[in-house]
């Protein structure tokens, strides 16, 4: 379970959460303080999130960051932020580029698909000798660099909240199912992905594409070999 949170109240709830290898606290952090607070439109949230990261690590939780880069994120800003996370002991970094989904509060600062690939190709080229602990599979990172073409697997990362199971993914607000079976059986999965739905046209998010990359890496001999080579590069 990846428990996604903005971490504003997380410190107050840590004692209620079980310490488990199957639970990861995924903390929303969209850059350094100025950028993060601007993106979420609330001053002080970056400091609260960082305090929560430190406290969660102190208590023994597995903690990752959930980071979105926007069009105005420079390579220098991204490097500074990723370097900042290292001494905090964050167990992994998940990254995505923002894309213009219908309910996004900010409709003006998005990478297109082409710019996404260009940005991550340059950024990931700087990730030498384990500089950053990136919590993605090797083949997904190749996709993010524009070196592979994948289709979305929208059912690969089911999302549950107090409202129920979100259809089809957390980036598109198209209702909720009361049960997991209802989610799987009533969602028209074939209607999603950048080839099939204009809402998804610029999406490269790991919630849909990581599952596709992992399937290739674990279900084909070629995928296994290519994935292994990338790990040891």
Regions from the language model: what does each represent?
Residues 1-4, 8-20, 58:
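Conserved Radical SAM active-site core
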Residues 3-4, 42, 71, 189:
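A generic secondary-structure micro-motif detector
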Residues 4-6, 66-68, 232-233:
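Structural motif
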Residues 7-8, 29-33, 221-224:
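Short, acidic/turn-prone active-site loops that include or flank metal/cofactor-
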Residues 7-11, 75, 79, 186:
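Structural motif corresponding to alpha-helix initiation and N-cap regions
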Residues 16-163, 167, 171-173, 216:
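Radical SAM enzyme [4Fe-4S]-AdoMet core and its adjacent flexible, acidic
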Residues 165-233:
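Flexible mid-to-C-terminal extensions adjoining Fe-S/redox cofactors in radical SAM and related proteins
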């Amino acid at each position: 379970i990846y428990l996604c949170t903005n971490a504003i109240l997380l410190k107050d709830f840590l004692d209620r959460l079980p310490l488990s290898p199957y639970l990861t606290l995924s903390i929303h952090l969209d850059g350094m303080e100025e950028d993060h607070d601007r993106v979420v439109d609330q001053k002080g949230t970056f400091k609260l999130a960082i305090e929560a990261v430190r406290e969660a690590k102190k208590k023994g939780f597995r903690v990752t960051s959930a980071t979105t880069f926007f069009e105005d994120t420079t390579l220098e800003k991204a490097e500074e932020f990723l370097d900042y996370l290292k001494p905090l002991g964050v167990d992994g970094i998940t990254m995505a580029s923002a894309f213009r989904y219908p309910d996004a509060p900010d409709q003006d600062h998005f990478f297109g698909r082409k710019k996404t690939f260009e940005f991550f190709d340059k950024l990931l080229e700087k990730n030498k000798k384990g500089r950053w602990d990136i919590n993605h599979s090797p083949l997904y990172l190749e996709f993010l660099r524009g070196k592979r073409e994948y289709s979305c697997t929208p059912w690969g990362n089911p999302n549950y909240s107090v409202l129920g199971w979100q259809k089809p993914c957390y980036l598109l607000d198209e209702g909720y199912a009361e049960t997991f079976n209802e989610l799987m059986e009533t969602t028209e999965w074939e209607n999603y992905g950048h080839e099939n739905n204009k809402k998804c046209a610029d999406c490269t998010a790991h919630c849909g594409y990581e599952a596709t990359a992992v399937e290739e890496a674990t279900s084909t001999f070629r995928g296994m070999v290519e994935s292994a080579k990338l790990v040891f590069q």
